[in-house]
Amino acid sequence: MKVSASSLRKGNVVDLDGKLYVVLSAQNIHPGKGTPVTQLDMRRISDGVKVSERYRTTETVERATVDDRDYTFLYEDGEGFHFMNPESYEQVTASAEMIGDAKYYLTDGCTVKLSTHEGVPIAIELPRLATFEVVDTEPTVKGQTASSSYKPAVLSNGLRTMIPPYITVGTKIVVLTEDGSYQERAKD
């Protein structure tokens, strides 16, 4: 469907010359003299190439029809990452390139939001928080609690993060999926 360039926002998917692009940032620029323009920074979905385009605010762009649905992660194999729609039990496979670093946060049965275009997954949105167990960290040294120092730790998903000194091996913690940072001790 055709939309004005000025109405595009981060996360929208556009179709330019038969190729799909995801909008990374959209900025409306109003110069003192001349026509206002919209600056779009986009990434081509097929190969990950970043492009930057300028459109007059009156120009139209073809917005791709994208289906956003909740899917349950099943497993990973040589073909890619397999997800199932919990309503229709339909399964889709996403490539490792499309999943990227999100693979560290995928656990059996976790629910994610997949964006699909004509049945092919093009983007993934993880839950904001995830819980993992600390499998390796340095022992706490007495007297270190006065300062707010953090120590390195390895989680059960293989991710490295910084945790407070009172957390020990075997403790479950909650991390932010955007950057893998420690949020709190799990409440279970």
From Swiss-Prot:
Domain of life: Bacteria
Pfam families according to UniProt: EFP, EFP_N, Elong-fact-P_C
Gene Ontology biological process: peptide biosynthetic process
Principal location listed in the UniProt entry: cytoplasm
Cross-referenced InterPro entries: Elong-fact-P_C, NA-bd_OB-fold, Rib_uL2_dom2, Transl_elong_fac_P/YeiP, Transl_elong_KOW-like, Transl_elong_P/YeiP_cen, Transl_elongation_fac_P, Translation_prot_SH3-like_sf
Cell compartments where the protein resides: Cytoplasm
Keyword annotations of the record: Cytoplasm, Elongation factor, Protein biosynthesis
Keyword Protein biosynthesis attributed: yes
GO CC, any one term: cytoplasm
Any one Gene Ontology molecular-function term assigned to this protein's record: translation elongation factor activity
Annotated pathway: Protein biosynthesis; polypeptide chain elongation
NCBIfam families: efp (TIGR00038), PRK00529.1 (NF001810)
Known function: Involved in peptide bond synthesis. Stimulates efficient translation and peptide-bond synthesis on native or reconstituted 70S ribosomes in vitro. Probably functions indirectly by altering the affinity of the ribosome for aminoacyl-tRNA, thus increasing their reactivity as acceptors for peptidyl transferase.
Similarity section: Belongs to the elongation factor P family.
Protein known as: Elongation factor P
Organism: Phenylobacterium zucineum (strain HLK1)
Lineage: Bacteria, Pseudomonadati, Pseudomonadota, Alphaproteobacteria, Caulobacterales
